[in-house]
């Protein structure tokens, strides 16, 4: 099921790319969109993404096994509260200081004004940092309960919304001007990420997950999460720096189309991983985490 849904997601992802290419092509607007739209996910990964992906699932399963449903719900509620505080704060800073955030992706370019549109769109996109964090926790909880449908199908809904936004770009721009069209695709892209996150919430209740959102920095489960996740920080920092330099260099080599070329090419070379490895690794990591908590190391091997 996961592989099938992943294929559907990739198909809609290709359609999304075609819709984007048809709407804004290979242009400065396209590059601005790519830079601004990729940055929220990069920042989420840098601040908490790697830690959540690596550490949340085994810690959650351990708490639920050893302390019960109520304790695991408290752990989830505490983590959500911290995400709202930290990622919400970063999202607010990104909205207010958008040009500075965009500079991290264009610092090699001598033309600072070339990314004005990217900064404008990033003001719409910054809240995605929070949405990605919340969605990651929701997906982790559902995966822990072997419920892979919504976490795998959610990107399809995201793609459909973004496709509709790009399809509306030309008529809206013709009727109300290009700035209105830019607002449409910026708002539509953020709406897609919100729906991708929010559509998973109803499924949580089916598994008895009703977290009480609060903040407790003394929670032992939180400390365990941080301890397990810290080693991934180096990898996420390296990835952020590498991607930032790549985008900045691309804007020097091809000032208007560099980031767009990279984005279109990346879609193809990540395809094998997205179709096969992603779904397998998601399911296997859940089983590995379960077996490790049960100390069934023979099954892990």
Give the ranges of each region predicted by the language model.
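Membrane-embedded alpha-helical bundles of multi-pass transporters/translocases
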Residues: 1-301
